[in-house]
């Protein structure tokens, strides 16, 4: 196996010393990059881009050619699992993802097949192994999945939603049906992520994008408990190294204490949670990742530098020198000038040396 040349991302997640703060960006391979748009155009559509190993590898590597990033993340979509379960994923321009079928009854849940990730999602595993090989040990590769709760919202609603009407209706009127669906999805995610690890993923992130739509008790019952089940079922070591796991619940900064119980090595934060407060709350028990508002990248070079330095000051305010990975608080948007993320990345590396040097 190729020796990893830059492992500071993995070391930071495990709260080990690093020489400078590692950084990657959620959605770092995306529409803001002209080379991504060109590759997507060649692929024809988004799903074809995800399912073509060569294209998926190319777009994964594109941001690493522009920026001094400390990790690559598999280019794929969180909805690959529901698609493999037979719901029929498709995308409508301007409307986001949709499914031909929904899951709204006990019978719908019972009809879902058992996922065999290595067979049903072989294109994802081919992409992971191809990207890992193409990286040549430059930086670690992150694999990922959506959380059961987040996947369930798309499956029950039939696509994106702001109110989650049908999912919350199920949660309060037929909680046993929702639990059956979430349990099925947790098993599917375990199989999916373990297959990614076998294929070469060196760290895992669970995207709980819609966990923040829940009240506290419901968050624990319908989201957090299933992420805990997943983490307990994951292969945690490969090639002599621990496979760190990051849990990111958007809008979940108030739940850091219960999130620690999931067994995750690190917790992702969005921009609404002050890093210094979060550091005090977790008290060195887990690493933290985040949390620049992606909209900061619309600003001038000076304003980006100022915001990044303030974020780092918060991250290291309590004197801790380990357990922090810089990132955005959510995915980078398509309207960002590709020159701006370089300011973010370079400022993180240069300014953090003040604390870590």
Swiss-Prot record:
Gene Ontology terms: biological process: protoporphyrinogen IX biosynthetic process from glutamate
EC annotation from Swiss-Prot or TrEMBL: 4.1.1.37
PROSITE patterns xrefs: UROD_1 (PS00906), UROD_2 (PS00907)
Location within or outside the cell: Cytoplasm
EC class name: lyase
Cellular compartments per GO CC: cytosol
Amino-acid positions noted as binding substrate in the UniProt annotation, renumbered to this chain: 27-31, 77, 154, 209, 330
Reactions catalysed, as given in the entry: uroporphyrinogen III + 4 H(+) = coproporphyrinogen III + 4 CO2
Keywords: Cytoplasm, Decarboxylase, Lyase, Porphyrin biosynthesis
Keyword DNA-binding: no
GO molecular function: uroporphyrinogen decarboxylase activity
SUPFAM superfamilies registered for this protein in UniProt: UROD/MetE-like (SSF51726)
InterPro entries from the UniProt entry: UROD/MetE-like_sf, Uroporphyrinogen_deCO2ase_HemE, Uroporphyrinogen_deCOase
Regions that span the bilayer: none
Listed pathway(s): Porphyrin-containing compound metabolism; protoporphyrin-IX biosynthesis; coproporphyrinogen-III from 5-aminolevulinate: step 4/4
Site for Transition state stabilizer, residues: 77
Pfam families registered for this protein in UniProt: URO-D
Binding partners and assembly: Homodimer.
UniProt-listed HAMAP family: URO_D (MF_00218)
Function as written in the Swiss-Prot or TrEMBL entry: Catalyzes the decarboxylation of four acetate groups of uroporphyrinogen-III to yield coproporphyrinogen-III.
Family from the record: Belongs to the uroporphyrinogen decarboxylase family.
Name of the featured protein: Uroporphyrinogen decarboxylase
Organism expressing this protein natively: Acinetobacter baumannii (strain AYE)
Highest classification ranks of the organism: Bacteria, Pseudomonadati, Pseudomonadota, Gammaproteobacteria, Moraxellales
């Amino acid at each position: 196996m190729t020796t990893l040349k830059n492992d500071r991302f993995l070391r930071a997640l495990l709260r080990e010393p690093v020489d400078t703060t590692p950084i990657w960006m959620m959605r770092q391979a995306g529409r803001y990059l002209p080379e991504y748009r060109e590759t997507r155009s060649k692929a024809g559509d988004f799903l074809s881009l995800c399912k073509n190993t060569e294209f998926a590898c190319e777009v994964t590597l594109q941001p690493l050619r522009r920026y001094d990033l400390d990790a690559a993340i598999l280019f794929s979509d969180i909805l690959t699992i529901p698609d493999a379960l037979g719901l029929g994923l498709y995308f409508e321009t301007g409307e986001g993802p949709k499914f031909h079928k929904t899951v709204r009854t006990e019978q719908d849940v019972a009809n879902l097949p058992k996922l065999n990730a290595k067979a049903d999602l072989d294109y994802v595993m081919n992409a992971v192994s191809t990207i890992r090989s193409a990286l040549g040990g430059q930086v670690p590769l992150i694999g990922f999945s959506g959380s059961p709760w987040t996947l369930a919202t798309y499956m029950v609603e039939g696509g994106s939603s702001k109110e989650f009407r049908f999912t919350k209706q199920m949660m309060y009127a037929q909680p046993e049906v929702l639990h059956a669906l979430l349990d099925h999805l947790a098993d599917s995610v375990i199989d999916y992520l373990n297959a990614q690890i076998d294929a070469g993923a060196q760290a895992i992130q669970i995207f709980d994008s819609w966990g923040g739509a829940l009240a506290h008790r419901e968050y624990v019952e319908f989201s957090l408990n299933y992420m805990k089940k997943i983490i307990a079922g994951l292969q945690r070591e490969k090639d002599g190294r621990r496979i760190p796991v990051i849990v990111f619940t958007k809008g979940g900064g108030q739940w850091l204490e219960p999130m620690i119980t999931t067994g995750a090595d690190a917790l992702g934060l969005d921009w609404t949670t002050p890093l210094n407060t979060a550091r005090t709350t977790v008290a060195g028990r887990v690493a933290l990742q985040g949390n620049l508002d992606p909209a900061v990248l619309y600003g001038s070079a000076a304003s980006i530098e100022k915001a990044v330095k303030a974020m780092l000051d918060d991250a290291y305010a309590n004197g801790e020198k380990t357990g922090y990975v810089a990132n955005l608080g959510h995915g980078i948007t398509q309207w960002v000038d590709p020159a701006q993320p370089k300011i973010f990345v370079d400022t993180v590396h240069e300014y953090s040396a003040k604390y870590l040097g």
